[in-house]
Design a protein with these regions (language model features):
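Residue-level detector of secondary-structure boundary/capping sites
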Residues: 4-7, 131, 184
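Conserved alpha/beta enzyme-core scaffolds, especially Rossmann-like or related mixed alpha/beta domains
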Residues: 1-31, 154, 192-211
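Non-catalytic terminal extensions that flank enzyme cores
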Residues: 60-61, 77, 166-168, 172-233
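Bulky hydrophobic/aromatic packing residues
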Residues: 1, 6, 81, 109, ...
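Active-site cores that bind ATP or allylic diphosphates and position pyrophosphate for catalysis
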Residues: 30-169, 176-180, 229-233
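Generic recognition of stable, solvent-exposed alpha-helical segments in well-folded globular domains
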Residues: 11, 135-138, 188, 206
């Protein structure tokens, strides 16, 4: 899919490049982790700006040894937005994230740029996704602003965890949606998940349409939810 949209991503990338905000980075992941830099909430390293000030001569010398990835310079400023589920959220891009990747060394465009360009191109006005992507939002809002694109409204839902508090994973033998659909009707699955999220008092079958009239983000918990024991036997 990304290969089909490469031209669109390149156009946006070149706009950022023309602003003087893009620079080559030669740091490896292992080097960054070894530097004991602070970590972001999603587990990544806060980039310390190691390659931000390289001279043209230094860049040329480093290119002889490896192809660079490319990062976007971020300002030392707070970006605040109101999340539909989590409420007001503030992040300082420089301190909480650092300059972030726009393009990998192999030429593939990074998620942050691709998702912004894709959503704007498709006219997306509301984004509902997992709370594990909350920390990406400030970066994306910064890109929307630089590219002069309309930003959607965001709502980040708490994650549904296994009953013992770990992330659900096929590798650990947890239920996949595919397996559940083989044993339950769609209404059964929706109703039980609605119960787990506190949207109804018992795990009775429901359709998404029947939940809409009483839905409010205020009813959705702000913290991750452990799947009730025995909900899906």
């Amino acid at each position: 899919y990304q290969s089909e949209c490469s031209g669109i991503y390149t156009e946006s990338y070149k706009k950022l490049e023309a602003m003087g905000l893009v620079y080559p980075c030669f740091c490896s992941r292992s080097q960054l982790h070894a530097a004991s830099a602070p970590h972001t909430s999603d587990g990544n390293v806060v980039y310390p700006g190691t390659c931000r000030g390289l001279t043209a001569e230094e860049i040329a010398e480093k290119r002889k040894k490896k192809a660079p990835a490319y990062r976007l310079m971020v300002p030392d400023e707070n970006i605040t937005f109101t999340d539909g589920c989590m409420g007001e959220h503030t992040e300082n891009l420089l301190r909480d994230c650092g300059d972030f990747y726009l393009r990998r060394a192999d030429g593939v465009f990074a998620y942050q740029l691709a998702v912004v360009v894709d959503d704007a191109r498709m006219g997306v006005t509301e984004v509902v996704r997992g709370a594990d992507l909350l920390s990406s939002t400030a970066r994306q809002l910064y890109l929307y602003r630089l590219l002069d694109l309309p930003a959607p409204k965001f709502a980040h839902c708490p994650l549904l965890l296994a009953s013992d508090g770990r992330r659900l994973s096929k590798r650990d033998g947890d239920q996949s949606l595919e397996n559940l659909r083989a044993r339950y009707t769609a209404e059964d699955i929706v109703g039980r998940l609605a119960y787990a999220y506190g949207l109804q008092e018992e795990p009775a079958p429901r359709t998404p349409e029947s939940l809409i009239k009483d839905f409010s983000w205020d009813k959705v918990p702000k913290k991750d939810i452990c799947l009730p024991e025995g909900l899906f036997e």
